[in-house]
Amino acid sequence: MASFQTLPEAVAALVHDGDTLALEGFTHLIPFAAGHEIIRQRRRGLTLIRMTPDLIYDQMIGCGCARKLVFSWGGNPGVGSLYRLRDAVENGWPNALEIEEHSHAAMANAYAAGASGMPSAFFRGYRGVELPEVNPQIRFVECPFTGETLACVPAHRPDVAVIHAQRADRQGNVLLEGIVGVQKEAVLAARRSLVTVEEVVDDLGARSPNAVVLPSWTVSAIAVVPDGARPSYAHGYYARDNSFYVQWDEIARDRDRFTRWIEEHVLA
């Protein structure tokens, strides 16, 4: 059952050096505040999983939190590249980073398999592409019923899943709505989970048709962190700070400027 904790308490209890960690949220509800707390607590040796690693993983990688990244597509959405990710891969700064690249379909299916307690995911994909040549985790099997060739990847079973949501009720049930990515699957696949929320309410209230409610028993800890997804957006609460994404392109290009920004805005 979910317990209500402060963000520093929850990260200290749930996220350990060497863990496999998934911070999920698709275009919005990206758990920036939680990622910054992980940086402040100086976690090291993490394997980071994310469908679309963007600024928060760029920051965590640049701060030396990660040893490996499992992902599909990485970039600064609508702007360009992730220069801290590139520096780690190309130059080993601040440390070497192993990468394992998949398609979006593979990542989503791997989360779904993990959430179902399955060891691997089977799906139609990777036909006529070269990614399987550089990723040995992508295999192909023959369906025993149809003879069709299917792609196969290991299930994602992170030690910890971290997401941001709009609200939780006082019983620890969590509501997220708007564009829903793989947050539900990531939480269900993980051994432990942390949800940051904008607010706690008596009743979750009216919800949109595509809303997801995570029952309390699926969540390890809830931390109330208003604005916890900024500079991404939280549907119904605040808009995306597009100007910051543009600014990050310049900040992240230079190691010294990046380090100063982290010291001033995350570690201070």
Predicted regions and their residues:
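Conserved alpha/beta enzyme-core scaffold
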Residues: 1-268
